[in-house]
């Protein structure tokens, strides 16, 4: 159901005093109209599984359409695309994502001079079935970044103050009430305006809200409670901020990184001579005793926090080939347990291992769209991918309890074309990407395994899985076939983008009480085959 809320600014509302008369707080609304949508039948078609499934990684030694390394060995990082969430309309592009609890909060803007934006809330509590629960569309304002905190979304962006009676300046922040995944009380929105062409980043810190607002803008500090102005500091060209403990890092495109203390005094400066591009957001991230900086065409700069020394440049890998040099820019960085993710615009999403002070480029993830922003939490990566919207990626790392059970098994390091001969009995652990599996003997796999092509358990063979098995893609379906007299035992998750065929005399057995079968194709079971055990049939195919 659509609700159109007329936006009438209350002129006598909460005028904040400050060192700048540009910084003003308004209780009520911003532009001519805001449109909300909470109807699941309208929202859910935004979620697409059309290209869900196994994601390849184009590796450093052989970038290209086949996605293979030179030796065709099994790859690490068995990633899978869970789903895509398309933008609310064809003009909008995903700009930022924040993940908190069971929900992801996604912002959208327009890349040209037109002002338009949106925010969506996505329920990710069921990793197999994400759902858009609520949406708010700003018809005359960009939303460039956001953060959820304690029942509110704090969103920042830009509006054309020349044509909006409600906006004393282009750069704004909105505090929007959220209840159980819904935007349900837009009359309670509070707005603040600060100097700068457009606000580009926001961070909740203790009981304050920090906002950066680009060229000729500021670092503005608001009260979290009611957006009362606390302080404002002018900077030439702020692009983003990052906070760890009481350390605050600012990226100023005119100079480099400034590290502030809790009183917003500069305690350290890192000079960076990089062309960050005009009016484009670039993020930075604390990591151990270093700071990672998105440096546009240069990739990611790694700097020492203690003395500001440049320690490393992590380059931009390109796949597919032929991407325009102007589209090869690092826009954002994120880290997760020793893995650096770089949002490289048209050059895609790249992965680099960063441990013990060294870096090793893994490759480029097989994704569509220009990657504007990346966030990672738990076992997931969330990529804001321009016109492709939000892409939800599962890392499929084995659970700690599973790792313990698999600890006595050797890690698999062989070919990505996995074959077991008649009479052979093999058992491996790992988190690997494979081309295919042909099993004619006895095979135990423990861990997480993604398979680009088919899995065939030949006549009278045995295959046991303890962990996660993902096969195929929804736009390139592949089958699992359990042939005559064969047995397939599963303790964990089987995610199949294709058909499951259980032939005469074959057995499919689910062990334990929490196994999952998520089959996107058909399940074909011979009348003399056996399926037993307790499991969750996600798509009702059995």
Residue ranges and their predicted role:
Residues 15-18:
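C-terminal motif of bacterial Sec signal peptides marking the signal peptidase cleavage site
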Residues 20-416, 431-437, 451, 476, ...:
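Feature marking well-ordered beta-strand scaffolds used for ligand recognition
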Residues 2-3, 477, 482-483, 527:
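Generic cytosolic/nucleocytoplasmic N-terminal low-complexity/intrinsically disordered segments
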Residues 3-9:
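Sec-dependent signal peptide recognition
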């Amino acid at each position: 159901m659509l609700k159109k809320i007329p936006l009438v600014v209350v002129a006598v509302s909460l005028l904040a005093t400050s060192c700048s008369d540009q910084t003003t707080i308004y209780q009520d609304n911003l532009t001519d109209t805001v449109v909300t949508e909470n109807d699941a039948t309208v929202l859910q078609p935004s979620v697409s599984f059309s290209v869900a499934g196994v994601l390849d990684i184009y590796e450093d030694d052989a970038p290209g359409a086949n996605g293979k390394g030179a030796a065709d060995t099994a790859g690490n990082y068995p990633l899978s695309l869970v789903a895509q969430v398309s933008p609310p309309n064809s003009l909008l592009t995903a700009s930022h994502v924040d993940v908190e609890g069971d929900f992801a909060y996604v912002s959208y803007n327009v890349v040209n001079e037109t002002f338009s934006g949106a925010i969506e809330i996505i329920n990710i509590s069921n990793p197999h079935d994400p759902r858009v629960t609520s949406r708010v569309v700003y018809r005359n304002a960009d939303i460039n970044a956001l953060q959820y905190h304690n029942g509110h979304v704090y969103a920042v962006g830009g509006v054309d103050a020349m044509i909006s009676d409600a906006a004393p300046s282009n750069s704004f922040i909105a505090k929007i009430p959220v209840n159980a995944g819904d935007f349900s009380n837009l009359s309670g929105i509070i707005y603040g305006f600060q100097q700068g062409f457009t606000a580009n980043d926001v961070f909740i810190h203790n009981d304050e809200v920090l906002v950066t607002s680009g060229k000729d803008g500021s670092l503005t500090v608001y009260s979290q409670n009611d957006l009362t102005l606390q302080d404002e500091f002018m900077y030439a060209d702020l692009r983003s901020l990052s906070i760890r403990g009481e350390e605050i890092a600012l990226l100023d495109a005119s100079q480099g990184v400034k590290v502030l203390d809790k009183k917003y005094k500069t305690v350290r400066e890192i000079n960076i001579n990089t062309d960050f591009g005009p009016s484009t957001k670039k993020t930075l991230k604390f990591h151990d005793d270093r700071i990672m900086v998105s440096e546009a065409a240069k990739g990611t700069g790694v700097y020492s926090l203690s003395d500001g020394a440049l320690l490393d440049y992590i380059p931009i890998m390109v796949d597919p080939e032929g991407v325009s040099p102007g589209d090869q820019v690092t826009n954002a960085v994120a880290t997760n347990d020793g893995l650096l993710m770089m949002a490289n615009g048209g050059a895609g999403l790249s992965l680099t291992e960063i441990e013990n002070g060294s870096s090793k480029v893994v490759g480029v993830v097989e994704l569509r769209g220009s990657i504007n922003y990346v966030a990672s939490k738990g076992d997931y990566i969330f990529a804001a991918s321009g016109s492709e919207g939000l892409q939800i990626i599962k890392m499929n790392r084995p659970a700690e309890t599973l790792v313990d059970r698999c600890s006595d098994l050797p890690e698999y390091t062989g070919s990505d074309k996995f074959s077991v001969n008649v009479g052979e009995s093999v058992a491996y652990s790992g988190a690997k990407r494979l081309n295919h599996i042909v099993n004619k003997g006895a095979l135990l796999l423990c861990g997480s395994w993604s398979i680009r092509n088919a899995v065939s358990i030949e006549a009278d063979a045995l295959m046991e899985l303890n962990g996660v098995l993902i096969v195929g893609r929804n736009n390139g379906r592949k089958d699992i076939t359990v042939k005559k007299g064969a047995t397939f035992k599963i303790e964990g998750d089987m995610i199949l983008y294709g058909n499951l065929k259980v032939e005469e005399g074959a057995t499919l057995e689910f062990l334990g009480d929490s196994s999952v079968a998520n089959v996107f194709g058909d399940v074909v079971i011979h009348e003399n085959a056996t399926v037993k055990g307790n499991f969750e049939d996600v798509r009702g195919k059995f």
